[in-house]
Curated annotation (Swiss-Prot):
An annotated GO BP: protein glycosylation
Pathway: Protein modification; protein glycosylation
Compartments it resides in: Golgi apparatus membrane
Membrane topology of the entry: Single-pass type II membrane protein
Residue ranges annotated as Cytoplasmic topological domain: 1-8
Transmembrane segments: 9-25
Membership in a protein family: Belongs to the glycosyltransferase 14 family.
Name of this protein: Probable beta-1,3-galactosyl-O-glycosyl-glycoprotein beta-1,6-N-acetylglucosaminyltransferase 7
Function: Probable glycosyltransferase.
Keyword annotations: Disulfide bond, Glycoprotein, Glycosyltransferase, Golgi apparatus, Membrane, Signal-anchor, Transferase, Transmembrane, Transmembrane helix
EC number: 2.4.1.-
Protein encoded by which gene: GCNT7
Length: 429
């Protein structure tokens, strides 16, 4: 039986010490001070990555100690494969993309995805291969500020898949600024005018990751949300009024773009709309998207949103509360498990603490957050970054095991991340 599955934590501590000693012996400290310090070769921590992941999912304390020096090198391997010469067949195979619909149920219910990205190339590839299926369609918005090398790498990957494309118009996206909303509108226009059929659209960013399978997502949509949009939110609370009553402008310090408040107060909402406040995440029907792109109220609301703070947290939920909008939910509140986020403001109340670190008041997950993530009822989790690569590596192995466990077609060998999985299958009901 694997040491990491042992019930006594003392065994895990011994394992951690043993691995550390082995790494130290393989990478002794240089006696030449000018050579600088050496670090354990991260690849040495990959003997049993699934077993370490299993221990992390089970919340074993010793596994957290091991994870501190086992920084998975997976990201650099992914980027290297993208830059290596070769054909698209090799790329899809080596990057473990699933190349066939996994069931008739999924094949007849195509989804559309809008993915906005600006950094973290390896994380984007991991996200894309987790949500990719050939019957779906994907619009990728690459931030206009992104480095040329990054844009080229994304384009080379996208070129290998007929149902993935870069948005026709790119924006310089600002945190809480209008251009994030505009970027998604641009993708919606492209999706509506594409040759692909799709029933619902889901928006993601490059630091998100699925915690439900494609089949799970479809069944969730078809449950109480059938033909309805999912836009969690409520009537704008008084504490949030300044976000829309005061104008905001975007400015660029040292290449970054931010939205900053002005002292000028703005006009009332168009058409006497009641403003709602909610999540920036959504699942929208195609008919609602077509409504957003053509309805006068939606267009006027978009113009009105150009200089408010965080317009994406007002725009979708406000329009989805209109009684005559397709698939609207006028009386809904915060219902809808779209994205799991640990907010700083909720720590100690509705959420346990962030085991990683907070950035912009939301948790960037660490290994200690994995048990909470996989128990969440949400479809996706946010947010992840390359500082803790093992988190996404573990999560995608767990997710792929679930995906293939639901498959109703023969599996291809390259759909697996390795020939034999050591992940604890009890984690995948």
């Amino acid at each position: 039986m694997s040491q990491l599955r042992a019930t006594k934590p003392g065994i895990l501590v011994c394992a951690a010490i043993g691995i550390f000693v082995f790494l130290y012996l393989r990478n002794p400290t240089s006696e030449d001070p000018e050579e600088g310090p050496t670090h354990p070769a991260v690849v040495e921590c990959g003997f049993y990555p699934d077993e370490l992941c299993s221990a992390l999912f089970e919340g074993k304390e010793a596994a957290l100690q091991i994870a501190k020096f086992c920084k998975d090198p997976h990201g650099s391997e992914i980027v290297a494969r993208l830059h290596r010469p070769g054909n698209c067949s090799r790329i899809s195979r080596e990057l473990h993309f699933i190349t066939r619909p996994l069931s008739a149920e999924e094949g007849t219910f195509p989804l559309a995805y809008i993915v906005t990205i600006h950094k973290e190339l390896a994380l984007f590839v991991q996200l894309l291969r987790a949500i990719y299926l050939p019957q779906n369609v994907y619009c990728i918005h690459v931030d206009a500020k992104a480095p040329k090398k990054y844009k080229t790498a994304v384009q080379s990957l996208v070129n290998c898949f007929e149902n993935i494309f870069i948005s026709s118009k790119r924006e310089k996206v600002a945190y809480t600024g209008f251009r994030r909303l505009q970027a998604e509108i641009n993708c919606m226009k492209d999706l509506v005018h594409s040759k692909f059929q799709w029933s619902h659209v889901i928006n993601l960013c490059g630091q998100d990751f699925p915690i439900k399978t494609n089949k799970d997502i479809i069944r969730y949509i078809r449950s109480k949300w059938n033909d309805k949009n999912i836009t969690p939110g409520v009537i704008q609370p008084p504490s949030n009024k300044s976000k829309t009553s005061q104008t905001h402008r975007e400015f660029t310090p040292e290449g970054n773009i931010y939205a900053s408040p002005n002292e000028r107060f703005r006009d009332d909402p168009p058409h006497n709309l009641t403003i709602y406040f909610g999540s920036a995440s959504y699942v929208l029907t195609r008919k609602f998207v077509e409504f957003v792109l053509t309805d006068t109220r939606a267009k006027d609301m978009l113009r009105w949103s150009q200089d408010i703070h965080g317009p994406e947290r007002h725009y979708w939920v406000t329009l989805n509360r209109l009684k005559d909008a397709p698939g609207s939910t006028p009386n809904a509140g915060w219902e809808g498990n779209v994205r799991a986020v640990k907010w700083r403001s909720e720590e100690g109340t509705v959420r346990d603490g962030c085991k990683g670190r907070y950035v912009q008041d939301s948790c960037v997950y660490g290994p200690g957050d994995l048990p909470w993530i996989i128990q969440s009822p949400s479809l996706f989790a946010s947010q992840f970054d390359s500082a803790e690569p093992l988190v996404v590596t573990c999560l995608e192995r767990w997710h792929r095991l679930r995906v293939l466990g639901q498959a109703e077609v023969p599996e291809e060998p390259h759909w697996h991340f390795q020939r034999e999985s050591h992940l604890n299958r009890r984690l995948n009901p």
